Amino acid sequence: MTALFLMSMLFGLTCGQAMSFCIPTEYTMHIERRECAYCLTINTTICAGYCMTRDINGKLFLPKYALSQDVCTYRDFIYRTVEIPGCPLHVAPYFSYPVALSCKCGKCNTDYSDCIHEAIKTNYCTKPQKSYLVGFSV
């Protein structure tokens, strides 16, 4: 009985570790608006990692929904709002961004995720940088 229990426990831990590669990960993003004087550097968390998936050989005979593969995506998230410094009065200086609290492997939801294969490399500043100074949760 003890050996069976230990083997079950070991199997559960192994599967748990294999399935937990989709986790909240620290990410630095740069936010700027054309009208504002500064670029804001923000530290947040995003969902990143690997999900178990399989490629189906009989693609011609299956509906499109069966062909989608799981991606590492948000389970729970909140939005935070920051104020971009150096904006003129006629420009709204606020920017909201998601903060991942927990992640899951699932279908990519374009309502709140970028579902492209390779992102365009735009995470840089062209203006002087300011660190995240003012922010509040929405």
UniProtKB/Swiss-Prot annotation:
Keywords: Congenital hypothyroidism, Disease variant, Disulfide bond, Glycoprotein, Hormone, Pharmaceutical, Secreted, Signal
One term of GO molecular function: hormone activity
SUPFAM superfamilies: Cystine-knot cytokines (SSF57501)
Propeptide: 133-138
Keyword presence, Disulfide bond: yes
GO biological process: anatomical structure morphogenesis; cell-cell signaling; G protein-coupled receptor signaling pathway
Entry-linked Pfam families: Cys_knot
Tagged with keyword Oxidoreductase: no
Signal peptide start and end residues: 1-20
SMART domains in alphabetical order: GHB
InterPro entries, per database record: Cystine-knot_cytokine, Glyco_hormone_CN, Gonadotropin_bsu, Gonadotropin_bsu_CS
Disease connection: Hypothyroidism, congenital, non-goitrous, 4: A form of central hypothyroidism, a disorder characterized by insufficient stimulation by thyroid stimulating hormone of an otherwise normal thyroid gland. CHNG4 is an autosomal recessive form characterized by isolated thyrotropin deficiency that, if untreated, results in severe growth retardation and intellectual disability.
Quaternary assembly: Heterodimer of a common alpha chain and a unique beta chain which confers biological specificity to thyrotropin, lutropin, follitropin and gonadotropin.
Family according to the record: Belongs to the glycoprotein hormones subunit beta family.
Role: Indispensable for the control of thyroid structure and metabolism.
Official protein name in the record: Thyrotropin subunit beta
Protein species of origin: Homo sapiens
